[in-house]
Each structure stands twice: as C-alpha cells, then as structure tokens.
A protein has these predicted regions:
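Pre-P-loop entry segment of helicase/translocase ATPase cores
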Residues: 1-31, 239-242
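Walker A/P-loop
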Residues: 29-50
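Catalytic acidic motif of RecA-like/P-loop NTPases
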Residues: 39, 130-134
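Conserved H-loop
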Residues: 39, 67, 159-162
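Conserved Walker A/P-loop ATP-binding site and its immediately adjacent core
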Residues: 59-81
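Inter-Walker segment of RecA-like/P-loop motor cores
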Residues: 73-125
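ASCE P-loop NTPase helicase motor core
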Residues: 81-84, 89-90, 126, 134-202
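ATPase catalytic-site recognition across NTP-hydrolyzing enzymes
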Residues: 187-244
C-alpha cells in the first residue's frame, strides 16, 4: 500500500478526484478547514485521511467527532468503505461501537461530539470534526488541548450554519488554517438542472448556505450580525456596578 495520501486514495478506489481533493491530500498543514456544499465529497476525504493516518502511523489515535451519533456513524462508514477496498473488512462489532483497533495498535473512534464524550481521550494524532458549524463551541475548546503533546492534526469540515459559532469564527478569523471552499457550482457531480430546481424550491438564504458556502443570518436569529456589530462601540465605557 502506498504511504502517500494521494496514492493511497487511488488505492482504495478514488481515482477521479476533484482538484481541491488532490490539493487536500497533498497538504501537510496541521490545521485544515473545509467549507463545502452538500454532496461535495468532504466526508469521503475525511475518511481517507483518517484511515491513512491509522494505517501508516502505528499507535495513532484518530478521533472523529460529530454533533450526533448519526453523523458520527456516517463518517465512520467512510472509513470502513476504505478498509473494505483494501480487502480488510471491519468487524461488525466495530460498527456497533463506532470504533476499531488495528493490528498496528492504531485506534479510530467516532463519537457524538459533546464535551463529556471526549474527556477520557488524550493525545489525538488526528482530530476530525464533522458538521463543525453545528457542534458546541465548548467542544472545540475542550479538544484543542488534546493536540498539545501529540502535535496532532485537526480537520474541521462543514457547510455553514449562520454567522455564529466556532466554525464561522475559524473560517473568518486570522489564525493560520489551510482553507478550502467548495461550492456546488464547482462540483462536477452536481448538475445545473438540479441546482435550478433547488433555487426554486428553497428560500434564497437556505440555497446560498447549502450550495454556495455562504454564512447567512439564521431564521431564528432575532438580531442580525450587522445589527449587533452596529450596536457595539468602543467609545462607550463599561458600566461600573460597584461590585467587589
């Protein structure tokens, strides 16, 4: 099996890769964020990278976090697909537990992403956060220290979910991340006829969010981000309540 992630992807049957997928597989950046439309192939890439890390770096701990068990199960299935393509099916018990330990002592664990579920883990070599726009900010702050000693890699992937939360903060912030934006218009597997149908069926802000990677104001947001920003002034002194 080839050690190079790009060659490894081809070895598990992914020969027809998009340009952004090729760049991602060739990247060695320690922090990666994927802002992608639905059905762009981001979960498949995350699964390939998780499996590659576990196979080629013995003793690795690979954690896959998602907002709910359903999403964790979906991404774990991408790992299992790659493993099967190598002729090594994952035991049925691993599907139930959403975790597998390989012969080289590497472990892959897929977890519903809450702060409590990850407290027992440390020293992750690869940490993948799926649907990152919908995980609690507390989870992100809890997992970052897990990479301190291991020097591990973090990959966040999601479609946007409003101008709020850690995914939006990281995407728009100054911190150095390897950033990938993949809209439906750039995905060869999504046809224009389908997108036209979606434009007619969906509210415009939903379409922009789901297919154009746009961070939109959410429908349950009483005050828009612009309204909040406009209300903040550095000229106003903090209120002294006389406490302390």
């Amino acid at each position: 099996m080839p050690d190079d992630p790009l060659a490894f992807a081809r070895a598990v049957g992914l020969s027809d890769l998009d340009d952004w997928q090729t760049r991602l597989l060739q990247s060695s950046a320690p922090r990666v964020i994927l802002n992608c439309c639905r059905q762009s192939g981001k979960s498949t890439m995350a699964g390939v990278l998780a499996l590659h890390q576990a196979l080629y770096h013995p003793g690795s701990l690979v954690l896959i976090l998602a907002p709910a068990e359903r999403q964790a199960k979906e991404l774990f299935s991408k790992v299992a697909e790659g493993y099967r393509a190598l002729g090594i099916p994952i035991p049925a018990e691993s599907y139930r537990k959403l975790g597998v330990e390989l012969a080289n002592r590497s472990r892959i664990e897929a977890l519903p992403g809450t702060e409590k579920t990850i407290r027992g883990f440390s020293g992750a070599n690869l940490l993948t956060v799926d649907e990152a726009s919908r995980v609690d900010d507390a989870l992100y702050y809890a997992v970052r220290p897990m990479l301190a000693v291991s020097g591990g890699r973090m990959i966040m992937l999601s479609t946007p979910f409003g101008k709020r939360g850690i995914f939006h903060e990281v995407w728009t912030g100054p911190e150095e991340w390897d950033r990938y934006e993949v809209s439906a218009a750039t995905c060869p597997r999504i046809f224009e006829a389908f997108l036209e149908e979606e434009r007619r069926a969906l509210p415009s802000w939903v379409y922009r969010q789901e297919y154009e990677c746009s961070f939109e104001e959410t429908d349950d947001q009483m005050f828009t981000t612009a309204m909040i920003d406009a209300a903040v002034s550095e000229d106003v002194k903090p209120l002294d309540l006389g406490v302390g």
